[in-house]
């Protein structure tokens, strides 16, 4: 599909995904913290679908879990293999493929991560197919954890980064808010994407037959802050994280967060 070729080209030749989590330390910290709530002491079989260059895959493998990484962009898989060789941590497999058609056996995994696919699929039928594939490859009682972009994320990006004088950005933002569609046109902004509302996220998980477990904000109210000074000091960082945790489920605050995480069970 044209949309996914555009997305693949963005990651293949325009954007360095390999150090994205270094550039977004609060998002990375919070994602690991939330994922950790669903990890067992026993060795788990985990599929990191759309896992890019393996930021979460290698973190999980380092803890002793068996991890298969899949991503749509060939460069990401090549970079993951290079990283594996440099840090001495092996994943079970490195697969270049489509999240809607997984190359795995039914009932293979204890945990499936979808930390990117749902926010790159603009068509609901594609998102549901992706979720149904995750359902298929999970064991009974297996857990799915999905990261999605908030419908309102670009409001904060626009005002924090002085983009509101850019007419094209404003056009993109207005489409985000009205329909959830993010189309970069001929700009250098983020690639083709879909921005969820909280209720739509819950609906799609349930349509794919998952039992809903939880939905939390990732950055929470900190999305509206310049967090560098809070994260550079250990004491301030712990204070920030403490209050993000305290407010991560408050309905009135969910829309502020740049990203949400939804958890379901097979």
Where are these regions (language model features)?
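C-terminal lobe and adjacent flexible extensions of AdoMet/dcAdoMet transferase-like proteins
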Residues: 208-266
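Class I SAM-dependent methyltransferase SAM/SAH-binding core
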Residues: 55-101
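A short acidic, Gly/Pro-enriched loop at the edge of an enzyme's catalytic core
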Residues: 100-112
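Acceptor-substrate binding/catalytic loop of class I
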Residues: 121, 185-199
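A short glycine-rich, Lys/Arg-flanked "PGG" loop and its adjoining helix->strand segment in the class I
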Residues: 128-140
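Conserved class I S-adenosyl-L-methionine
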Residues: 1-50, 55, 59, 143-175
């Amino acid at each position: 599909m044209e949309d996914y070729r555009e997305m693949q080209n963005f990651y293949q030749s325009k954007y360095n995904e390999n150090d994205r989590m270094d550039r977004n330390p609060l998002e990375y910290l919070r994602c690991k913290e939330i994922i950790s709530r669903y990890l067992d002491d026993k060795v788990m079989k985990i599929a990191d679908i759309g896992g890019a260059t393996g930021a979460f895959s290698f973190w999980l493998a380092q803890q002793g879990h068996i991890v298969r990484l899949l991503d749509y962009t060939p460069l990401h898989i090549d970079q993951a293999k290079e990283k594996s060789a440099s840090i001495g941590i092996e994943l079970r497999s490195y697969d270049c493929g489509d999240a809607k058609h997984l190359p795995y056996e039914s009932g293979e995994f204890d945990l499936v991560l979808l930390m990117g696919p749902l926010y790159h699929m603009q068509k609901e039928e594609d998102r549901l197919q992706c979720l149904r594939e995750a359902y298929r490859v999970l064991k009974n009682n297996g857990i799915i954890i999905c990261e999605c972009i908030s419908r309102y994320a670009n409001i904060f990006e626009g005002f924090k980064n002085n983009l509101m004088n850019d007419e094209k950005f404003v056009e993109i933002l207005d489409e985000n808010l009205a329909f959830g569609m993010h189309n970069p046109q001929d700009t250098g902004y983020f690639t083709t994407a879909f921005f969820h509302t909280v209720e739509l996220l819950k609906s799609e998980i349930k349509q794919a037959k998952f039992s809903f477990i939880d939905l939390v904000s990732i950055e929470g109210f900190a999305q509206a802050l310049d967090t560098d000074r809070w994260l550079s000091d250990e004491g301030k960082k712990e204070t920030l994280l403490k209050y993000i945790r305290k407010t991560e489920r408050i309905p009135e605050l969910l829309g502020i967060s740049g990203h949400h995480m939804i958890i379901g069970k097979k």
